[in-house]
Protein backbone atom coordinates (compact mmCIF):
# COMPACT_ATOMS: atom_id res chain seq x y z
CA UNK A 1 0.00 0.00 0.00
CA UNK A 2 1.40 3.42 -0.95
CA UNK A 3 2.25 6.19 1.45
CA UNK A 4 -0.35 8.95 1.58
CA UNK A 5 0.56 12.27 0.00
CA UNK A 6 0.88 14.20 3.28
CA UNK A 7 3.13 11.63 4.97
CA UNK A 8 6.91 11.35 4.95
CA UNK A 9 8.79 8.70 6.90
CA UNK A 10 11.86 10.88 7.35
CA UNK A 11 10.00 14.02 8.47
CA UNK A 12 11.26 15.44 11.80
CA UNK A 13 8.79 15.70 14.67
CA UNK A 14 8.95 19.51 14.80
CA UNK A 15 8.06 19.81 11.11
CA UNK A 16 5.20 17.35 11.53
CA UNK A 17 3.84 19.39 14.46
CA UNK A 18 3.89 22.57 12.37
CA UNK A 19 2.15 20.93 9.42
CA UNK A 20 -0.61 19.55 11.62
CA UNK A 21 -1.26 22.80 13.47
CA UNK A 22 -2.06 26.43 12.83
CA UNK A 23 1.63 27.36 12.73
CA UNK A 24 1.84 26.16 9.14
CA UNK A 25 0.24 29.52 8.24
CA UNK A 26 2.57 31.50 10.52
CA UNK A 27 5.18 33.46 8.52
CA UNK A 28 7.65 32.95 11.36
CA UNK A 29 7.89 29.26 10.46
CA UNK A 30 9.29 30.14 7.04
CA UNK A 31 12.89 29.89 8.25
CA UNK A 32 12.17 26.48 9.78
CA UNK A 33 10.86 25.17 6.46
CA UNK A 34 13.80 26.72 4.59
CA UNK A 35 16.25 24.91 6.85
CA UNK A 36 14.28 21.71 6.25
CA UNK A 37 14.63 22.13 2.48
CA UNK A 38 18.40 22.49 2.92
CA UNK A 39 18.37 19.30 5.00
CA UNK A 40 16.48 17.44 2.26
CA UNK A 41 19.07 18.57 -0.27
CA UNK A 42 21.85 17.16 1.88
CA UNK A 43 20.37 13.82 2.95
CA UNK A 44 18.60 12.95 -0.36
CA UNK A 45 15.09 12.89 1.11
CA UNK A 46 12.01 14.64 -0.24
CA UNK A 47 8.98 15.91 1.67
CA UNK A 48 6.53 17.28 -0.88
CA UNK A 49 3.86 18.26 1.65
CA UNK A 50 6.27 20.35 3.73
CA UNK A 51 7.74 21.98 0.64
CA UNK A 52 4.29 22.92 -0.62
CA UNK A 53 3.54 24.47 2.78
CA UNK A 54 6.65 26.64 2.40
CA UNK A 55 5.69 27.72 -1.11
CA UNK A 56 2.22 28.58 0.18
CA UNK A 57 3.80 30.81 2.82
CA UNK A 58 5.80 32.52 0.06
CA UNK A 59 2.56 33.00 -1.87
CA UNK A 60 0.95 34.79 1.09
CA UNK A 61 4.17 36.64 2.02
CA UNK A 62 6.05 37.44 -1.22
CA UNK A 63 8.65 39.52 0.62
CA UNK A 64 9.89 36.36 2.37
CA UNK A 65 10.53 34.43 -0.85
CA UNK A 66 14.07 33.10 -1.26
CA UNK A 67 14.83 32.31 -4.88
CA UNK A 68 17.52 29.74 -4.08
CA UNK A 69 15.20 27.81 -1.78
CA UNK A 70 12.45 27.77 -4.42
CA UNK A 71 14.77 26.41 -7.10
CA UNK A 72 16.08 23.79 -4.67
CA UNK A 73 12.51 22.65 -4.01
CA UNK A 74 11.89 22.32 -7.74
CA UNK A 75 15.15 20.46 -8.32
CA UNK A 76 14.24 18.04 -5.53
CA UNK A 77 10.84 17.53 -7.17
CA UNK A 78 12.61 16.48 -10.38
CA UNK A 79 14.22 13.59 -8.50
CA UNK A 80 10.86 11.93 -7.76
CA UNK A 81 9.40 11.87 -11.27
CA UNK A 82 7.00 10.66 -12.55
CA UNK A 83 4.79 12.40 -10.03
CA UNK A 84 2.71 15.58 -9.74
CA UNK A 85 5.23 17.06 -7.29
CA UNK A 86 6.89 19.46 -9.74
CA UNK A 87 3.59 20.70 -11.19
CA UNK A 88 2.13 21.25 -7.72
CA UNK A 89 5.16 23.28 -6.66
CA UNK A 90 5.17 25.26 -9.89
CA UNK A 91 1.49 26.16 -9.48
CA UNK A 92 2.23 27.98 -6.21
CA UNK A 93 4.83 30.30 -7.73
CA UNK A 94 4.10 33.84 -8.99
CA UNK A 95 2.33 34.02 -12.35
CA UNK A 96 5.23 35.77 -14.10
CA UNK A 97 7.50 32.79 -13.40
CA UNK A 98 5.30 30.28 -15.21
CA UNK A 99 6.61 28.64 -18.41
CA UNK A 100 4.07 30.36 -20.66
CA UNK A 101 3.81 33.88 -21.98
CA UNK A 102 2.34 36.41 -19.57
CA UNK A 103 -0.50 38.61 -20.81
CA UNK A 104 0.38 41.61 -18.68
CA UNK A 105 3.08 43.89 -20.15
CA UNK A 106 4.67 44.55 -16.76
CA UNK A 107 4.79 40.84 -16.00
CA UNK A 108 6.43 40.20 -19.37
CA UNK A 109 9.08 42.80 -18.61
CA UNK A 110 9.75 41.22 -15.21
CA UNK A 111 10.00 37.80 -16.79
CA UNK A 112 12.55 39.00 -19.35
CA UNK A 113 14.87 40.56 -16.78
CA UNK A 114 14.71 38.09 -13.92
CA UNK A 115 17.36 35.40 -13.42
CA UNK A 116 14.91 33.72 -11.05
CA UNK A 117 12.29 33.41 -13.79
CA UNK A 118 14.87 32.03 -16.21
CA UNK A 119 15.84 29.42 -13.63
CA UNK A 120 12.22 28.37 -13.08
CA UNK A 121 11.57 28.02 -16.78
CA UNK A 122 14.74 26.01 -17.35
CA UNK A 123 13.72 23.60 -14.59
CA UNK A 124 10.23 23.37 -16.09
CA UNK A 125 11.86 22.34 -19.36
CA UNK A 126 13.76 19.56 -17.59
CA UNK A 127 10.55 18.39 -15.93
CA UNK A 128 8.78 18.19 -19.29
CA UNK A 129 11.58 16.09 -20.76
CA UNK A 130 11.59 13.67 -17.84
CA UNK A 131 7.83 13.28 -17.69
CA UNK A 132 7.70 12.61 -21.43
CA UNK A 133 10.52 10.03 -21.19
CA UNK A 134 12.87 12.03 -23.42
CA UNK A 135 15.83 10.96 -21.34
CA UNK A 136 18.61 11.52 -23.87
CA UNK A 137 17.31 15.03 -24.54
CA UNK A 138 17.08 15.64 -20.78
CA UNK A 139 20.77 14.94 -20.26
CA UNK A 140 21.88 16.93 -23.29
CA UNK A 141 19.79 19.88 -22.07
CA UNK A 142 21.16 19.56 -18.53
CA UNK A 143 24.73 19.57 -19.85
CA UNK A 144 24.17 22.38 -22.34
CA UNK A 145 24.25 25.35 -19.96
CA UNK A 146 26.30 26.20 -16.87
CA UNK A 147 23.16 27.60 -15.26
CA UNK A 148 21.76 24.08 -15.00
CA UNK A 149 24.88 22.98 -13.14
CA UNK A 150 24.46 25.89 -10.73
CA UNK A 151 20.79 25.07 -10.17
CA UNK A 152 21.38 21.43 -9.20
CA UNK A 153 24.62 22.03 -7.28
CA UNK A 154 22.93 22.22 -3.86
CA UNK A 155 21.11 18.90 -4.29
CA UNK A 156 23.40 16.06 -3.28
CA UNK A 157 23.42 13.15 -5.71
CA UNK A 158 21.03 14.80 -8.17
CA UNK A 159 22.26 12.92 -11.23
CA UNK A 160 22.33 9.59 -9.40
CA UNK A 161 18.79 10.08 -8.09
CA UNK A 162 17.51 10.87 -11.58
CA UNK A 163 19.31 7.85 -13.02
CA UNK A 164 17.64 5.62 -10.45
CA UNK A 165 14.22 7.02 -11.33
CA UNK A 166 14.88 6.47 -15.04
CA UNK A 167 15.97 2.90 -14.29
CA UNK A 168 12.75 2.32 -12.34
CA UNK A 169 10.69 3.45 -15.33
CA UNK A 170 12.75 1.31 -17.71
CA UNK A 171 12.20 -1.68 -15.43
CA UNK A 172 8.45 -1.17 -15.65
CA UNK A 173 8.47 -1.15 -19.44
CA UNK A 174 11.23 -3.38 -20.78
CA UNK A 175 12.36 -6.98 -20.47
CA UNK A 176 15.38 -6.31 -22.67
CA UNK A 177 17.03 -3.10 -23.79
CA UNK A 178 20.19 -2.52 -25.87
CA UNK A 179 23.10 -1.39 -23.73
CA UNK A 180 23.83 1.43 -26.16
CA UNK A 181 20.34 2.87 -25.69
CA UNK A 182 20.43 2.59 -21.91
CA UNK A 183 23.85 4.28 -21.86
CA UNK A 184 22.30 7.34 -23.48
CA UNK A 185 19.21 7.29 -21.29
CA UNK A 186 21.31 7.17 -18.12
CA UNK A 187 24.07 9.46 -19.44
CA UNK A 188 26.76 6.96 -18.50
CA UNK A 189 29.80 7.69 -20.63
CA UNK A 190 31.34 4.21 -20.70
CA UNK A 191 30.18 0.63 -21.01
CA UNK A 192 32.03 -0.21 -17.80
CA UNK A 193 30.08 2.44 -15.87
CA UNK A 194 26.81 1.17 -17.32
CA UNK A 195 27.52 -2.45 -16.42
CA UNK A 196 28.46 -1.44 -12.89
CA UNK A 197 25.27 0.59 -12.49
CA UNK A 198 22.88 -2.07 -13.78
CA UNK A 199 24.58 -4.78 -11.71
CA UNK A 200 25.03 -2.95 -8.40
CA UNK A 201 22.07 -0.58 -8.40
CA UNK A 202 19.46 -2.40 -10.48
CA UNK A 203 20.52 -6.06 -10.11
CA UNK A 204 19.95 -6.56 -13.83
CA UNK A 205 21.81 -8.95 -16.12
CA UNK A 206 24.29 -7.93 -18.80
CA UNK A 207 24.04 -10.31 -21.76
CA UNK A 208 27.07 -10.26 -24.08
CA UNK A 209 26.29 -13.50 -25.90
CA UNK A 210 25.01 -11.81 -29.07
CA UNK A 211 26.51 -9.36 -31.51
CA UNK A 212 25.30 -6.47 -29.36
CA UNK A 213 25.27 -6.22 -25.58
CA UNK A 214 21.77 -6.38 -24.13
CA UNK A 215 20.56 -5.52 -20.64
CA UNK A 216 18.01 -8.01 -19.37
CA UNK A 217 15.45 -6.89 -16.80
CA UNK A 218 13.91 -9.53 -14.51
CA UNK A 219 10.21 -10.16 -14.86
CA UNK A 220 8.03 -8.05 -12.58
CA UNK A 221 4.32 -7.29 -12.36
CA UNK A 222 4.74 -4.21 -14.55
CA UNK A 223 6.77 -5.57 -17.47
CA UNK A 224 5.30 -9.07 -17.65
CA UNK A 225 3.08 -9.70 -20.64
CA UNK A 226 -0.16 -11.21 -19.40
CA UNK A 227 -3.11 -12.41 -21.42
CA UNK A 228 -6.36 -11.57 -19.76
CA UNK A 229 -9.71 -12.97 -20.77
CA UNK A 230 -12.83 -11.40 -19.34
CA UNK A 231 -16.21 -13.03 -19.64
CA UNK A 232 -19.55 -11.53 -18.81
CA UNK A 233 -22.86 -13.26 -18.49
CA UNK A 234 -25.72 -11.52 -20.23
CA UNK A 235 -29.16 -12.72 -19.22
CA UNK A 236 -32.15 -12.97 -21.57
CA UNK A 237 -34.00 -10.43 -19.44
CA UNK A 238 -31.32 -7.84 -20.28
CA UNK A 239 -31.95 -8.34 -24.00
CA UNK A 240 -35.67 -8.09 -23.35
CA UNK A 241 -35.28 -4.64 -21.83
CA UNK A 242 -33.21 -3.47 -24.79
CA UNK A 243 -35.74 -4.83 -27.32
CA UNK A 244 -38.70 -3.28 -25.50
CA UNK A 245 -36.95 0.07 -25.29
CA UNK A 246 -36.09 0.00 -28.99
CA UNK A 247 -39.61 -1.05 -29.96
CA UNK A 248 -41.12 1.75 -27.90
CA UNK A 249 -38.92 4.36 -29.58
CA UNK A 250 -39.72 2.96 -33.02
CA UNK A 251 -43.46 3.26 -32.36
CA UNK A 252 -42.98 6.87 -31.26
CA UNK A 253 -41.18 7.72 -34.50
CA UNK A 254 -43.87 6.04 -36.62
CA UNK A 255 -46.62 7.91 -34.78
CA UNK A 256 -44.89 11.20 -35.51
CA UNK A 257 -44.35 10.39 -39.17
CA UNK A 258 -47.79 8.87 -39.84
CA UNK A 259 -50.13 10.69 -37.46
CA UNK A 260 -53.29 9.89 -39.49
CA UNK A 261 -52.83 6.14 -39.91
CA UNK A 262 -55.80 3.99 -38.84
CA UNK A 263 -54.13 0.59 -38.76
CA UNK A 264 -51.21 -0.19 -36.46
CA UNK A 265 -47.96 -1.44 -37.97
CA UNK A 266 -47.01 -4.96 -37.05
CA UNK A 267 -43.42 -6.09 -36.49
UniProtKB/Swiss-Prot annotation:
A cellular component annotation (GO) from this entry:
eukaryotic 48S preinitiation complex
Q: Which GO terms describe its biological process?
A: formation of cytoplasmic translation initiation complex; regulation of translational initiation
Its annotated compartments are: Cytoplasm
Please tell me whether the keyword Metal-binding is annotated for this protein.
no
Say if the entry is tagged with keyword Cytoplasm: yes
Functional note: Component of the eukaryotic translation initiation factor 3 (eIF-3) complex, which is involved in protein synthesis of a specialized repertoire of mRNAs and, together with other initiation factors, stimulates binding of mRNA and methionyl-tRNAi to the 40S ribosome. The eIF-3 complex specifically targets and initiates translation of a subset of mRNAs involved in cell proliferation.
| Protein family per UniProt | Belongs to the eIF-3 subunit K family.
Name this polypeptide is given? Eukaryotic translation initiation factor 3 subunit K
Phylogenetic placement of the source organism: Eukaryota, Fungi, Dikarya, Ascomycota, Pezizomycotina
